[in-house]
Amino acid sequence: MKNLKKLPLILSILSLASFITPVNADVKVVASIKPLHSLASYLMDGVGKPDLIVEGYGSPHGFSMKPSHAKILQNADLIFWVGEDLEIFLEKPLSSIAKK
């Protein structure tokens, strides 16, 4: 839940970054679930399109990552996720990315 308190700050930074970033820069944004993807899509309107990890009607509770998802995460400039309480499957991949 403490990550939800940080969400307004992160969204503010992303919206400010869209004004600072040159138009031709390719910002790679990834969202873990559809509600976060929707917010990121709204903020990135005209700048780019975020990728989504849990697609369709998939549930983040029992989700299994594929190698293609790991590659998307590794190439991302910004990752939106709720936290390890909801998205346990992202805990290890994000900690390994953070070490790099």
Each language-model region and where it sits:
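Bacterial N-terminal signal peptides
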Residues: 8-19
